Design a protein with these regions (language model features):
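AAA+ P-loop NTPase nucleotide-binding core of proteostasis motors
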Residues: 1-47, 51-60, 64-185
């Protein structure tokens, strides 16, 4: 669907919505290998990042925009080629928001917010030929609108989370339990 959308981008009046991918599977099952093979078959540049190494911009570690910089480097600094590449973010399940914490979460929710901007399609300024921003490195603008984002993770507790949600009583709709908050029954 993604590359059909890119190919028909200017030909049709109807725009096909961008669809990124989520791959779920245990560690070592071949998610990364599958993405590498896909990029090779499609002859598009590929950048692979580990979500656990991503942090909010300004902190030690890679920010989410540095992944776009890696993609640009994989495309030999050809912006147009990079804009049709693939970014694979592995271990995405590790950056889930922590419950009931009052501490600054520089590698969880902040990364999620930064990632949403890229996944939906935005323009990002990234350095040419380098992974760090400094005054001496020229910047180019990369539009993420046509970049295919594939995220992968093991999601070990997913089955239990689904069971919990399915077993909950409905709180709205026809099956809602309509008790008054002052009922003691």
């Amino acid at each position: 669907n993604h590359y059909k959308r890119v190919a028909t981008d200017t030909m049709d009046e109807i725009e096909i919505e961008k669809s990124n991918m989520l791959m779920i599977g245990p560690t070592g099952c071949g998610k990364t290998y599958l993405v590498k093979t896909l990029a090779k078959l499609l002859d598009v540049p590929l950048a692979i990042a580990d979500a656990t190494s991503l942090t909010e911009a300004g902190y030690i570690g890679d920010d989410i925009e540095s992944v776009v910089s890696k993609l640009l480097a994989a495309a030999d600094n050809d912006v147009e080629r990079a804009e049709h590449g693939i970014i694979f973010i592995d271990e995405i399940d590790k950056i889930a928001k922590k419950k009931n914490t009052n501490q600054r979460d520089v590698s969880g929710e902040a990364v999620q917010q930064g990632m949403l901007k890229l996944l939906e399609g935005s323009e990002v300024e990234v350095p040419v030929g380098a992974n760090s921003k400094n005054a001496m490195v020229p910047l180019v603008t990369v539009n993420t609108r046509n970049i295919l984002f594939i995220c992968g993770g093991a999601f070990p507790d997913l089955e239990n989370i689904i069971k919990e949600r399915l077993n909950k009583q409905a709180s709205i709709g026809f099956y809602a339990d309509l008790k008054d908050k002052y009922d003691n029954d």
